[in-house]
Swiss-Prot record:
Biased composition (Low complexity): 166-177
Signal sequence region: 1-21
Name of the protein: Thiol:disulfide interchange protein DsbD
Function: Required to facilitate the formation of correct disulfide bonds in some periplasmic proteins and for the assembly of the periplasmic c-type cytochromes. Acts by transferring electrons from cytoplasmic thioredoxin to the periplasm. This transfer involves a cascade of disulfide bond formation and reduction steps.
GO cellular component term, pick one: plasma membrane
Catalytic activity as recorded in UniProt: [protein]-dithiol + NAD(+) = [protein]-disulfide + NADH + H(+); [protein]-dithiol + NADP(+) = [protein]-disulfide + NADPH + H(+)
Gene Ontology molecular functions: electron transfer activity; protein-disulfide reductase [NAD(P)H] activity; protein-disulfide reductase activity
Length: 600
């Protein structure tokens, strides 16, 4: 397969372009009055943006959200748990793909959502706790919202309420809605339609793994074992090889399901910075094994036992061949251990059972395609072994190195994320240019590889050159406006009193890690030199409400803050400036114009 390296080099050219992320969120209450800054809000309260309803029918609780036009809910921020109550399995309709510069790719809901929740075992005081978050498309995010629903006793077998009683929850009304839950087959179709690229990518990776030096030379031997050493018709050979591959695919699919299921239980932990750093180190270790620094494989004793178990099966028979394939899926060669581990880490991160099963099944099918071809058409279809197989293995190492950058760019500044992508691109395309003369083809194909490598080097070097050629701008971006953090209402009152004594105006910025537009303010507005000069005479305060703790909620209510970003202003006399509040992102010039209009 002489065009394989061509395909992978073009694929890598796409992979090494910086990937920017999404994810935002969330909801707060609007029950307080603006004791500090009675300002008109541009955005509606959370209960108007995402009207929430729930009603219980026997042993099923139906949870419904309406979504106002111009707003959306985040799928991965919807959490449902029980208190004194066992909840059965449930699923959310697959959300729409959405991309954001700062938080990556997530799924969102822009239309009504209904979740039928099966209730299994009731205890006195049973409650269902629902958490969710959402944003406005205009760049305004709500803090996390929590709803508590009291559950009446029920009979799970008869599906009828035994002792109806009035719902005492003060947080949630329970009117019935007309939203019908999405059927299982529709949900499955939506998942497959929205993640169509995942199986194709894993299929391509499987084919690529087949051409590594630990795998390709084994295909003729493996084919002989599968066919039982007999001369068979092409139809029989095709059937046996397909059955073998299906056995291997079954093992991979089960691995995908198990790992995705485990990942689903720890999705919050998998987003923690320390966990992301740990996973990044693991991916780097896997990549280094592909570069030949060391070998990763099962312990020799385990491999010997699995091989003997596989050899005990009867080649040429359908059950025996299927069993051989299933067992072979557990025997990872040094060339496949790292990529397979990386694939399993990917599906663990996704926490999606369907994605895990389909991705690993496609990977196994990709690895099995050459085996099927050899079984049916003979060894003449296989390319000659050579150093080019080591090149394929090394290429997988660079692909694995892209994974930790995807993970780390969620927690490192954009500048360092750009540096990491540039470094990876320079290393990969530099290696590709270095080895182009040793590839198993010449002529225009070799020239094309050289052109791709040079273009990749130039593209990878561009971000670094931009920083080096504009040192003033880079230094300006690294240096951020220094805010004084306040944690509660008392600290705000003290800071306002101190600023009044100094005769200085005050700007209070509400910030949260989940707020997309807050990061836009940091990157584009607060880094601007003119904005820095304008705010040099202000007392700059910042409240980090990421955790949405009681003191954060108290502060938000006191200032009638519905969501983020929100920026408040007080003049030098310590009085709130009418109509000065900023909700939603403002670029440099509109921000400066706004301050001027408000006399600040």
């Amino acid at each position: 397969m002489r065009t394989l390296i061509l395909c992978f080099s073009l694929l890598f050219a796409l992979l090494t372009q910086p990937a920017w992320a999404i994810f935002g969120n969330n909801a707060g209450n609007n029950t307080g009055t603006a004791s500090f800054a009675p300002t008109q809000n541009r955005f509606v309260p959370v209960d108007e943006a995402f009207p929430f309803n729930a009603f219980q029918q026997g042993s099923t609780l139906f949870i419904d959200w309406q979504v106002k036009e111009g707003y959306y809910l985040y799928q991965d921020r919807i959490s449902i748990s029980g208190e004194n109550l066992e909840i059965g399995e449930y699923s959310l309709t697959e959300g729409e793909p959405y991309h954001d510069e700062f938080f990556g790719d997530v799924k969102i809901y822009t239309t009504p959502l209904s979740v039928p929740l099966p209730l299994v075992a009731y205890q006195s005081g049973a409650k269902v706790i629902v958490q969710y978050q959402g944003c406005a498309k205009a760049g305004f995010c709500y803090p996390p919202e929590t709803r508590v629903i009291d559950i009446t006793p029920f009979n799970a077998e008869s599906n009828r309420v035994i002792e109806p009683k009035t719902n005492t929850s003060t947080q949630t009304t329970l009117p019935q809605t007309d939203n019908a839950p999405t059927s299982a087959q529709d949900s499955l179709a939506n998942k497959l339609a929205q993640n169509w690229w995942t199986p194709l990518l894993f299929l391509a990776l499987g084919v690529g793994l087949a051409f590594t030096p630990c795998v390709l030379p084994m295909y003729p031997i493996l084919t002989s074992i599968v066919l039982g050493g007999a001369q068979l018709t092409q139809r029989r050979a095709l059937l046996l090889s397909v059955i073998y591959v299906q056995g291997m695919a079954l093992t991979y699919t089960l691995l995908g399901l198990v790992v995705a299921s485990a990942g689903l239980q720890f999705q919050a932990a998998l987003q923690h910075p320390y966990v992301l750093m740990g996973l990044s180190v693991l991916f780097v270790a896997l990549a280094l094994s592909m570069f030949g620094l060391y070998s990763l494989q099962l312990p020799s004793g385990v491999q010997t036992w699995l091989n003997s178990l596989s050899n005990a099966q009867q080649g040429g028979s359908l059950p025996g061949v299927f069993a051989m394939g299933a067992i072979s899926g557990l025997v990872c060669s040094p060339c496949t251990t790292a990529p397979l581990s990386g694939a399993l880490l990917y599906v663990a991160q996704s926490g999606d059972l369907l994605t895990g099963a389909v991705a690993l099944y496609a990977l196994a099918i990709g690895m099995g395609i050459p085996l099927i071809l050899v079984a049916v058409f003979g060894n003449k279809l296989l390319p000659k072994a050579g150093n080019w197989m080591e090149r394929v293995k090394t290429l997988f190492g660079f692909v694995l190195l892209a994974a930790p950058i995807f993970l780390l760019e969620r927690i490192v500044p954009e500048f360092w994320s750009s540096v990491l992508w540039s470094a990876l691109g320079l290393a990969a395309f530099g290696w590709l240019y270095h080895v182009k003369n040793s590839l198993p083809f010449g002529g225009w194909k070799q020239s094309l590889i050289g052109i791709v490598a040079i273009l990749g080097l130039l593209a990878s070097a561009q971000p670094l050159l931009n920083h080096w050629l504009a040192p003033t701008q880079t230094a300006q971006q690294v240096k951020q406006i220094q805010f004084t953090r306040i944690a509660n209402l008392s600290e705000l009152q003290s800071a306002l009193a101190e600023a009044k004594a100094q005769g200085k105006s005050v700007m209070l910025d509400f910030y949260a890690d989940w707020c997309v537009a807050c990061k836009e303010f940091e990157k584009y507005t607060f880094h601007a030199k003119q904005v820095e000069n304008k705010l040099s005479g202000f007392v700059l305060l910042q409240a980090d409400v990421t955790k949405n703790q009681p003191q954060d909620i108290e502060l938000l209510k006191a200032l009638n803050v519905l969501g983020l970003p929100t920026i408040e202003f007080w003049n030098a006399q310590g009085e709130p400036v009418p109509n000065a509040r900023i909700t939603g992102f403002m670029a440099e010039q509109p921000f400066l114009d706004h301050l001027t209009q408000q006399g600040l």
